[in-house]
């Protein structure tokens, strides 16, 4: 503070002490009915929240005045939410003692710290998304990566062997906040994911937070299991990351977080891997440009009716399975619901009444729940028996398993409804929340408040009868409280236990012990009732908190049922089929459709297409055709169908047989990375390099216009080299859809046995070009570029001139011809193809056995190659 320390008030010193311990937070300091902010916190809050900045100590010189601003306590959550959304941390400092009964300085302390990754308030969260905080720890070339959504209790940890895997996992969970420390955590790939791709809040950790012994002790104490039981024994990076994250959450929440009851270790081998480019290009959860849910795959598939189901659907989409049996169980459950429309309809109606069990339970455990939340929870519990009944009517083993996992929680619903009034106030400390009949002491206090006048009248009548004083009255004033008034004419009849308090001209005023006790009861009944109701509420809250495990298991089962019901509803509505998942390598799709494009088309039918990929003679599909014809849509369609199938969904096709795919890679579109100063071509090459490094023979590659960011010859050479590498069984042999404008690459079908040409059919009618949107075998030698330019609205004079130039180029033979032979498998490279061929030829020559004439012939061949 600007004020000298010796001149500070006790409250100001108290503020300084608390602020000193929370320097990275904006401190909301409770003063009566307001939360006040001071100094730099006030300046920041005033700017970000559009608050009026004022000062304390206005009588002092300006340089000694303290900037301040404040917000009302009853609307504080909305202000906190705005700051957290902007990336700030907020520390909430509450009054721990009642100012009305406290002599001297009110005790204050931090009750919680709100950060982007630790929010639990419903008004600050998207109910359909998890809100993860992550912890990244690097050591010895490995990375421990832990994720926790404190609002639901979900806690995951994994170990990554390289920065690319870290980036992929960060993309999968999309945390709001990341704590990082250790070797390699600032690698470019990771930092790019954190800052540019995710834009999340990054906290730089310090060594004291990442100690193995402390992490082991904390994890074993919290989860009441040893590391072997937790599944992370010997995995030091995972242990340290998990322990550091849990400690941060405990420090921030000021709570034991008993709803975080399971640490789930997972390996990358359990789920299909999707890097951040694939997630973006396939528009799984949001569109690339508008960043909106509408227009994404999630938008099409999300017919869930519970908040938990919405979050789980997103999770299934982010984590397609690699276990054929588990995938099949999901498909079986969806099929069961597809074939039973009555059950599906009744289940849907029951799910609509289920509240967000996970997040309400978290607010119960963390002490931030209110009575309205509890009544909503009870209504959700009341819907559970019907959910169980409908699942019992199904035949799917998975649906039966979910039914068995659902606890109807009738006892909890009864307790809540028998305790809380039907329409409670929003706050829990102001009374009026406990139902009549729930507690005898509360009822008695309520009777005292409601029947005070009746009690007084009863005492007055009783005293008249006992004393025989007809004029006796019981009255009240602020000086004496309740008193008995007796006229002078009856003074000799006043009982000895009456205590005289006042003498007036015509009467005397007395008090009795009974009246003083009544006064104490009546005057303090409201305050005592309010305190008692809060005590009853906290007892109810603590009882419910002990049911966290029951509620969470039920919530997970309900969420899964909701997702399966959603997928079934979409399958019926859109005419999807059950895919067959195999351990083979082939993808066979009959009449496949793009799920999103089909959904947005209103007056036009989507043109379906077949896909046959992965066989010995059809490993790589080269797709040619004009811009706007639908190449990119088709390739994305195939990738989305594969992903949908492996997440457990039916797919938009007449039939589909899909060999398990471990990774989907995409190289689609072109854009400069201005933030890092990289050109379009550099971005493209970096993505291609990553694909070729991490893809396997089980991967699906979607490659669109490789090489177009550079000159024609360089681009064509690179495109061909990448194609050869992907097709080569010795190098990669991955299933590949390869769209290109380099029509010369169509000759690869004759050179490589597992490459096939396809094109997008186009029909010309006079000067008009009609896109048929149909994939047909064979290559096309015409890009229809000028026709597309005409459709785009290029002026006719420019179009005419372009036709003249094209005729001149074609007459001069200006089209590039690719005449080089296919390089040997061990020669495929991204370098210049001619140079590579010369090197390969030289390496193949055995100089010791070469005759002079053979040497001359070889030299002639090399010279011809260079020409």
Q: Where in this protein do the model-derived segments appear?
A:
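Charged catalytic and DNA/RNA-contacting regions of genome-maintenance
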Residues: 1-336, 345, 352, 356-365, ...
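Conserved phosphate-binding elements of NTP-dependent enzyme cores
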Residues: 2-5, 9, 13-17, 24, ...
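ATPase nucleotide-binding head domains, primarily ABC-like/P-loop NTPase cores
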Residues: 39, 235, 305-306, 310, ...
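Active-site phosphate-binding and catalytic loops of NTP-dependent enzymes
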Residues: 93, 116-125, 256, 392-398, ...
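Conserved catalytic alpha/beta cores of large enzymes that bind or transform nucleotide phosphates
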Residues: 170, 175-183, 514-547, 650-653, ...
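Amphipathic heptad-repeat alpha-helical coiled-coil/stalk segments that mediate oligomerization
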Residues: 210-220, 272-276, 288, 379-458, ...
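Intracellular alpha-helical coupling/juxtamembrane segments of multi-pass membrane proteins
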Residues: 327-330, 350, 354, 448, ...
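Terminal-proximal interaction/regulatory segments of ATP-powered molecular machines
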Residues: 477, 843-867
């Amino acid at each position: 503070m600007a004020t000298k320390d010796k001149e500070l008030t006790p409250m100001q010193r108290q503020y300084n002490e608390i602020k000193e311990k929370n320097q990275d937070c904006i401190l909301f300091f409770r003063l009566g009915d307001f939360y006040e902010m001071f100094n730099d916190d006030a300046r920041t809050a005033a700017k970000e929240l559009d608050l009026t900045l004022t000062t304390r100590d206005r009588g002092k010189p300006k340089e000694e005045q303290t900037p301040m601003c404040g917000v009302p306590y009853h609307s504080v959550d909305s202000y906190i939410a705005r700051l957290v959304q902007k990336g700030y941390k907020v520390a909430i400092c509450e009054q721990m003692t009642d100012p009305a009964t406290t002599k001297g300085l009110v005790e204050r302390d931090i009750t919680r710290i709100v950060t982007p990754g630790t929010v639990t308030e419903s008004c600050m969260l998207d109910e359909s998304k998890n809100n993860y905080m992550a912890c990244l720890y690097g050591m010895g070339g490995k990375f421990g990566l832990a994720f926790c959504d404190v609002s639901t209790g979900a806690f995951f940890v994994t170990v990554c062997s390289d920065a690319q895997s870290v980036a992929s996992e960060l993309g999968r969970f999309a945390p709001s906040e990341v704590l990082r420390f250790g070797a390699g955590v600032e690698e470019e790939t990771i930092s790019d994911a954190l800052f540019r791709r995710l834009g999340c809040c990054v906290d730089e950790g310090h060594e004291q937070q990442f100690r193995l012994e402390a992490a082991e002790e904390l994890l074993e104490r919290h989860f009441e299991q040893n590391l072997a039981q937790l599944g992370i024994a010997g995995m030091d990076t995972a242990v340290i990351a998990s322990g550091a994250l849990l400690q941060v959450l405990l420090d921030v929440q000021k709570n034991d977080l008993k709803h975080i009851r399971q640490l789930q270790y997972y390996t990358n081998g359990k789920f299909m891997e999707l890097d951040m480019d694939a997630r973006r290009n396939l528009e799984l959860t949001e569109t690339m440009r508008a960043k909106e849910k509408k227009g994404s795959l999630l938008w099409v598939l999300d017919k869930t009716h519970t908040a938990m189901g919405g979050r789980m659907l997103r999770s299934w989409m982010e984590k397609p399975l690699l276990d054929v049996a588990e995938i099949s169980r999901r498909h079986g459950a969806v099929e069961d619901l597809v074939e039973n429309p009555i059950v599906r309809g009744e289940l849907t109606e029951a799910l609509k009444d289920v509240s967000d069990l996970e997040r309400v339970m978290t607010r119960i455990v963390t002490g931030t729940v209110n009575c309205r939340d509890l009544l909503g929870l009870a209504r959700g519990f009341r819907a559970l028996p019907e959910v169980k009944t409908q699942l019992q009517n199904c035949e799917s083993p998975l649906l039966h398993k979910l039914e068995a996992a659902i606890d109807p929680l009738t006892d909890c619903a009864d307790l809540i409804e028998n305790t809380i009034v039907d329409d409670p106030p929003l706050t829990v400390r102001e009374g009026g929340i406990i139902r009549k009949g729930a507690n005898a002491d509360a009822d008695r206090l309520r009777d005292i408040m409601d029947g005070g006048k009746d009690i007084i009248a009863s005492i007055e009548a009783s005293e008249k009868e006992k004393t025989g004083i007809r004029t006796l009255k019981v009255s009240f004033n602020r000086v004496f409280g309740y008193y008995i008034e007796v006229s002078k004419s009856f003074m000799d009849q006043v009982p000895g236990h009456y205590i005289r308090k006042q003498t007036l001209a015509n009467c005397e005023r007395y008090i009795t012990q009974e009246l003083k006790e009544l006064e104490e009861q009546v005057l303090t009944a409201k305050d005592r009732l309010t305190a008692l109701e809060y005590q009853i509420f906290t007892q109810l809250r603590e009882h419910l908190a002990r049911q966290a495990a029951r509620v969470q298991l039920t919530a997970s089962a309900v969420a899964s049922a909701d997702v399966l019901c959603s997928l079934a509803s979409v399958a019926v509505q859109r005419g999807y089929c059950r895919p067959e998942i195999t351990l083979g390598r082939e993808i066979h799709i009959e009449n496949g459709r793009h799920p999103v494009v089909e959904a947005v088309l209103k007056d036009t039918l989507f043109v379906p297409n077949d896909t046959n990929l992965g066989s010995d003679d059809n490993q790589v599909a080269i797709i040619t055709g004009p811009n706007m014809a639908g190449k990119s849509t088709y390739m994305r369609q195939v990738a989305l169908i594969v992903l949908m199938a492996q997440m457990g969904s039916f797919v938009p096709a007449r039939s589909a047989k899909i060999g398990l795919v471990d990774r989907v890679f995409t190289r689609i579109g072109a854009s400069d990375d201005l933030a890092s100063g990289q050109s379009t071509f550099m971005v493209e090459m970096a993505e291609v390099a990553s694909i070729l490094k991490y893809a396997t023979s089980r991967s699906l590659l979607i490659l669109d216009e490789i090489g177009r960011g550079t000159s024609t010859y360089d681009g064509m050479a690179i495109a061909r080299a990448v194609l050869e590498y992907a097709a080569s069984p010795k190098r990669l042999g991955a299933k590949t859809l390869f769209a290109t404008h380099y029509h010369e690459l169509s000759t690869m079908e004759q050179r490589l046995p597992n490459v096939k040409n396809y094109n997008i059919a186009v029909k010309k009618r006079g000067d008009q070009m009609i896109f048929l949107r149909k994939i047909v075998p064979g290559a096309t030698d015409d890009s229809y570029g000028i026709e597309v330019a005409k459709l785009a609205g290029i002026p006719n004079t420019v179009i005419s001139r372009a036709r003249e130039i094209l005729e001149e180029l074609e007459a001069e033979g200006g089209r590039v011809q690719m005449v080089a032979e296919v390089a040997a498998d061990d020669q495929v490279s991204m370098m210049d193809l001619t140079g590579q061929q010369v090197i390969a030829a030289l390496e193949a020559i055995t100089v010791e056995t070469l005759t002079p004439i053979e040497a001359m012939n070889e030299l002639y061949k090399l010279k011809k190659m260079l020409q």
